[in-house]
Amino acid sequence: MKNLILFFALFLSSLTLFGQQQETLFGKSNVVGAFGGPIVEYNFANDNTQVSVGGGGAVIIGDFFLGGYGMGTTNPSWIDNVDPFKVELGHGGFWIGGTFPSHKLVHFFSSAKIGWGAVNIRFYDDNVRIDDNVFVLEPEAGVELNIFRWFRIAATANYRWVDGINPAITGVDRNYYNGFGANLTFRFGGFGNHWQKWDD
C-alpha cells in the first residue's frame, strides 16, 4: 500500500507542471486534440511475470488527458492446487494523465488508470469458470518520446493495486496481482497546439 501511495503522489505532483511548444523527432506537434493506441504491460507480482495487452484513448486538454482504457492478461497463470486452475485478470475504466513539458522531444509522462474488472478462474478438469469482481488502481510515471507529430511512445514504471479478490471464492491470494511493473504506451492522434506558434 505504501508503494501505491508513493506512485499516486508522484502522479498528482506532476499535475502542477505546464508545457509550452512542441518538439518532435520528425516534425512539429500540437497540444490539444485526441489520441488512441495500444498498451503493453509487464507486471512482476509474486515472482511471476504477467503480461497484459489492451488499449486506450483520450481527449487532450493542454498537457493533460482524460479518457478510458481496457486491459487483459495474455499469459494466464496456472495455480497447482488440489484442483489445478487457470487465473486471468481483465479490467477497464477511466484513464487520466499528463505530459510535462509535452513540447519537448523527450518529456515526463504520468498517468493513472482507475477501473473495474474481474479475476477469471477456470478449472483444468471440468472447465468450470468463476468470476470475482475487482477494483484496479494503477499509477505510472516515466518518459515519452515524440516520434512524429501524430505518434508518441511512452515507457513507464507502474504499480498495480487490485482490490476485491476473495480467496474463499477464487483460491487466489488477495495480493496476487499487486506489484510493480513496466508499460509501453503507443499514442496515435492529434496533439495540436492551437494557441502558440512556432518561431521561424
Please name every model-derived segment.
Residues A34-Y42, V59, G68-G72, S110-W116, ...:
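Transmembrane beta-barrel strands of outer-membrane/channel proteins
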Residues M1-E23:
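Bacterial Sec-dependent N-terminal signal peptides
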Residues N30-A34, G62-F64, K104-S110, R149-I153, ...:
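Outer-envelope beta-barrel architecture signal
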Residues D63-L137, L145-I147, T185-F188:
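Gram-negative (and chloroplast) outer-membrane scaffold detector with strong preference
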Residues D47, S77-D80, V119-D125, G164-A168, ...:
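Outer-membrane beta-barrel proteins
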Residues N146-D200:
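Predominantly the C-terminal beta-signal and adjacent terminal strand-loop region
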Residues S29-V31, N46-Q50, F85-H91, V128-V136, ...:
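Transmembrane beta-barrel outer-membrane domains
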Residues G19-Y69, R187-D200:
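Short glycine/proline- and aromatic-enriched beta-strand/turn motifs that initiate or cap beta-hairpins
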